């Protein structure tokens, strides 16, 4: 009797702590299988996924997926942990969430050991789709990391809706979609009235790559309304290598810089003060104080989730502020 009373008391205390620390990561717990009255069918680019039970042990193989689950308050059983953005840092060192390896190459042995009942993956893991599907229902996030021109934001919103249905979080999912719409409307209203042209470039160990309309960051131009300073850049995951002369000739009004090296090394590497390049300093962007060092975690590690999209939009807005 004493032991039972003690357990109840401990449970009440733990419950209170969780309430007070609402930012704690959601960790999957072993629960009774919950069959669905009607199976959920998710159509995606790699096929069709049928979900017959409410998932309770979810494996997330990408930081975008971790953010979706976090925003929908869905517990996570396992995730890749090699590059965790600052806004998901609470998950990195949580021992009850299994480390499934690297984003680019998850550890299949650890995924098997986890025994997930749902796997969330992206095009980076397309080659593992068949194998993963034999282990558990596997949903492919149809985002295009090479060319986001077209339906980037719509794909994000649809994925939120799909996950809301899978986890019985439909109302919260609709709320998150409304938040995305409001943020997109905010930046579109701003860019529609402005004539400034911008370049999006990535810094990597002293070199630069540029991203155009049909690139990884194409949605910045075709959805969010930023006017490109150059249309000569082809579709690419890592951008087209460019020189300082290219940036100088494009002469953007706004220059957005993604510091990939900062992500890889875990600390900022460059800033405007230390970017001692005379050609860059001749651009309108430099002269007018419109060189924006964006949130590299949001732009490079993610950029296709709820939180990261909001951060990307906030970074874009900075380029139009006085």
Swiss-Prot record:
Residues 1-22 form the signal peptide. It comes from the Bacteria. Belongs to the bacterial solute-binding protein 8 family. A lipid is attached at residue 23 (S-diacylglycerol cysteine). Part of an iron transport system composed of the outer membrane receptor FatA, the periplasmic binding protein FatB and the inner membrane proteins FatC and FatD. One of its GO terms (cellular component) is outer membrane-bounded periplasmic space. It comes from Vibrio anguillarum (strain ATCC 68554 / 775) (Listonella anguillarum). It is a lipid-anchor. Residues 57-322 form the Fe/B12 periplasmic-binding domain. Its main location: membrane. This is Ferric-anguibactin-binding protein FatB. GO terms for biological process: iron coordination entity transport. Involved in the uptake of iron in complex with the siderophore anguibactin. Binds ferric-anguibactin in the periplasm and mediates its transport into the cytoplasm.
